């Protein structure tokens, strides 16, 4: 009969960012424990607050099934001597397995016959195994940072205060550090800090709410959402949507309630992004806006308790925010005393990266790269691109960005407008940081896009030049994000800029800094971009269609993306399977291709002439379709070759004895394969 497992780890406040991952890791760890022990189980539930992590598993088997275990020993040739007597190797293996040598069996494997010890193992009770599993699970939760406390030889995110562990309502006995497991949990630290008994998950959830704890983060999130909307309505405003903040705050509290506070309207002269950043990043406050989206002088904060006098909480939060905003106002006013262009010189004293020089040197490189892009793609904005690139990093040495790094670029735009720069240049200063996250907003203007592309490419190529290449677990310079940003901007804008030329232009500007051969760096950078492009496209289209196109060429990202989309649509045809098989057959026969011209005089079968004629006609139509970037039409034309290809393979022996005839037939198939290759490598497609 299946039973339920319940585990709660109660501790001091865990950082909000640790909790969701710990919940996911607990699920993975218990699955690993049960799977390794051959214990069947059902639904797994994980919950978490700043003070507790909860794991509940339903339908856990009472015991392991009995098992027959086979341990492989030495090969037969080493296990017996010429007279058939067991050798020391066989005797030692039997002794190690705890059985007599006569009980060993011969097992036939792919490598030959081997000795094996086959033993029956009686399954153990789950209740007997859990005291070993659960402390191991607790100790294996991989927190980003963990700590020891007192003199105990265990680690956890924060010191543990209690552990409740139950299987079928009975305590699972074990110790972790100085804590013995039991059947009691505890309520809210400030509102009901008393122990209460736990029987199972359902009973636990009921008791928690009675003791002012909401263990389910999704329920807490919805409570917070409803609370901030209620309070915003009372304040005659609207909550500025911020799902990331909502997610974070839901892991900061156990029993949320919302209160409304205000700040002086005088602070509204400071750019709204600064005010929002100060409230969100530093205080975890939700901002309020009016019906037109204008920022209101108010905020909503989430409290972890229900207070008798909310105004006490409000006043405290208002006082803290007032100090923050006063600092912001001071920096804003002081920064206005120095023109943005005057700050550019200060970048010479800011080290961008030890091997790549200062921020000023970086600016000079990507300014030239941005001008090159503008010259090739929109020459009318060259001067604006040059100006925006010159100024776009200057706000890094301003007081405001020094205090609030999150508003870099935004303040550059504000200061540029204040100094009388063109609005297009000012906007490009802010846009050049875009996108700031996957799927985020992209630069709206060509000016901002060119500066953004140039800056990001210089970052990627610069790091690769000096060996700072991302690994599977580390990407300290966010090069993957920069590469995806470049790809998304190019695709969104439709820029037909060969990626290889763009990379080479960037590397030429970095030649003096490079510690690796530039040709090697270029190959690595292009491989890096190919990986990002393939991953991005594979989220939208079948992976084999993506690989089929990207393996041929992805230098023109816009063209490659369009070909992938066309190929993905083309493969939905009912006759795609047979088409793919025919195309693959051609490609497999002429893997390297034959460069000799096709001679009709060497044809010995009518099928050869028919295929040659069909290829000639289709090649022209495909070329026209490719010029128009109508890749679906090109694929449709190529598909018309199938009858002629099928007839050719039915009637003609490609590998003829006559060398000239054989080469002529291979040349004919090479023409077809190269026509396919103008779009994709069909050998990579699944029928």
UniProtKB/Swiss-Prot annotation:
<keyword id="KW-0067">ATP-binding</keyword>
<dbReference type="Pfam" id="PF02092">
    <property type="entry name" value="tRNA_synt_2f"/>
</dbReference>
<comment type="similarity">
    <text>Belongs to the class-II aminoacyl-tRNA synthetase family.</text>
</comment>
<comment type="subunit">
    <text>Tetramer of two alpha and two beta subunits.</text>
</comment>
<dbReference type="InterPro" id="IPR015944">
    <property type="entry name" value="Gly-tRNA-synth_bsu"/>
</dbReference>
<keyword id="KW-0547">Nucleotide-binding</keyword>
<keyword id="KW-0030">Aminoacyl-tRNA synthetase</keyword>
<dbReference type="InterPro" id="IPR006194">
    <property type="entry name" value="Gly-tRNA-synth_heterodimer"/>
</dbReference>
<dbReference type="InterPro" id="IPR008909">
    <property type="entry name" value="DALR_anticod-bd"/>
</dbReference>
<dbReference type="GO" id="GO:0006420">
    <property type="term" value="P:arginyl-tRNA aminoacylation"/>
</dbReference>
<keyword id="KW-0963">Cytoplasm</keyword>
<dbReference type="GO" id="GO:0005829">
    <property type="term" value="C:cytosol"/>
</dbReference>
<dbReference type="GO" id="GO:0005524">
    <property type="term" value="F:ATP binding"/>
</dbReference>
<dbReference type="Pfam" id="PF05746">
    <property type="entry name" value="DALR_1"/>
</dbReference>
<protein>
    <recommendedName>
        <fullName>Glycine--tRNA ligase beta subunit</fullName>
        <ecNumber>6.1.1.14</ecNumber>
    </recommendedName>
</protein>
<keyword id="KW-0648">Protein biosynthesis</keyword>
<dbReference type="GO" id="GO:0006426">
    <property type="term" value="P:glycyl-tRNA aminoacylation"/>
</dbReference>
<keyword id="KW-0436">Ligase</keyword>
<dbReference type="GO" id="GO:0004814">
    <property type="term" value="F:arginine-tRNA ligase activity"/>
</dbReference>
<dbReference type="GO" id="GO:0004820">
    <property type="term" value="F:glycine-tRNA ligase activity"/>
</dbReference>
């Amino acid at each position: 009969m299946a039973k339920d497992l319940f585990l709660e780890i109660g501790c001091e406040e865990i950082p909000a960012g640790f909790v969701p991952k710990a919940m996911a890791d607990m699920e993975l760890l218990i699955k690993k424990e049960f799977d390794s022990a051959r214990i069947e189980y059902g639904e797994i539930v994980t919950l978490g607050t700043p003070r507790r992590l909860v794991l509940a598993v339903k339908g856990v088997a009472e015991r392991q099934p009995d098992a027959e275990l086979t341990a492989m020993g030495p090969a037969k040739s080493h296990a017996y001597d010429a007279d058939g007597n067991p050798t020391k190797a066989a005797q030692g293996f039997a002794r190690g397995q705890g059985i007599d040598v006569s009980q060993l069996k011969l097992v036939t494997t792919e490598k030959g016959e081997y000795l094996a010890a086959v033993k029956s193992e009686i399954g153990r009770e789950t209740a007997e195994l859990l005291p070993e599993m659960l402390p191991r699970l607790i100790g294996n939760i991989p927190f980003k940072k963990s700590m020891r406390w007192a003199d105990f030889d265990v680690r956890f995110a924060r010191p543990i205060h209690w552990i409740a562990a139950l299987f079928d309502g009975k305590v699972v006995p074990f110790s972790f550090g100085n804590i013995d497991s039991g059947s009691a949990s505890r309520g809210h630290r400030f509102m009901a800090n008393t122990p209460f008994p736990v029987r199972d998950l359902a009973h636990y959830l009921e008791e928690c709410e009675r003791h002012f704890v909401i263990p389910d983060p999704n329920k807490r999130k919805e409570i917070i959402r409803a609370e901030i909307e209620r309070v915003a309505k009372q304040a005659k405003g609207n909550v500025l949507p911020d799902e990331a903040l909502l997610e974070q705050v839901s892991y900061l509290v156990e029993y949320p309630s919302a209160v409304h506070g205000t700040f002086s309207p005088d602070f509204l002269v400071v750019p709204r992004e600064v005010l929002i950043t100060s409230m969100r990043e530093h205080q975890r406050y939700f901002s309020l806006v009016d019906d037109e989206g204008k920022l209101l002088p108010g905020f909503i904060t989430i409290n972890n308790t229900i207070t008798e006098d909310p105004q006490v909480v409000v006043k405290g939060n208002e006082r803290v925010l007032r100090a923050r905003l006063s600092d912001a106002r001071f920096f804003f006013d002081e920064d206005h005393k120095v023109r943005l262009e005057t700050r550019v010189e200060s970048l010479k004293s800011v080290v961008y990266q030890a091997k790549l020089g200062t921020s000023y040197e970086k600016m000079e490189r990507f300014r030239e790269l941005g001008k090159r892009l503008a010259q090739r793609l929109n020459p009318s904005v060259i001067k604006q691109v040059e100006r925006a690139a010159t100024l776009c990093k200057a706000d890094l040495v301003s007081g405001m960005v020094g205090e609030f790094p999150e508003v870099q670029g935004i303040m550059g735009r504000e200061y540029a407008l204040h100094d009388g720069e063109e609005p297009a240049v000012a906007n490009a200063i802010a846009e050049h940081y875009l996108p700031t996250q996957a799927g985020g907003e992209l630069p709206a203007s060509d000016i901002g896009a060119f500066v953004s592309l140039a800056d990001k490419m210089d970052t990627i190529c610069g790091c690769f030049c000096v060996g700072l290449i991302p690994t599977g677990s580390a990407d300290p310079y966010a090069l993957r994000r920069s590469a995806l940003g470049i790809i998304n901007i190019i695709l969104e804008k439709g820029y037909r800029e060969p990626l290889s030329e763009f990379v080479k232009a960037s590397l030429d500007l970095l030649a003096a800094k490079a510690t690796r051969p530039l040709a090697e760096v270029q190959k690595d950078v292009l491989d890096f971009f190919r990986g990002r492009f393939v991953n991005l496209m594979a989220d939208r289209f079948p992976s084999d269609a993506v690989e089929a196109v990207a393996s041929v060429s992805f230098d023109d990202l816009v063209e490659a993306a369009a070909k992938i989309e066309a190929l993905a649509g083309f493969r939905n045809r009912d006759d795609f399977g047979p088409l793919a098989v025919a195309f693959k057959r051609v490609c497999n026969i002429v893997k390297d291709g034959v460069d000799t011209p096709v001679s009709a005089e060497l044809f010995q079968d009518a099928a050869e002439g028919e295929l040659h004629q069909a290829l000639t006609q289709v090649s022209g139509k495909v070329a026209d379709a490719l010029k128009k970037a109508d890749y679906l039409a090109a694929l449709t034309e190529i598909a018309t070759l199938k009858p002629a290809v099928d007839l050719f393979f039915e009637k003609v022996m490609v590998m003829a004895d006559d060398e000239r005839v054989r080469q002529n037939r291979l040349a004919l198939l090479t023409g077809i394969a190269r026509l396919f290759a103008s779009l994709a490598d069909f050998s990579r497609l699944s029928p």
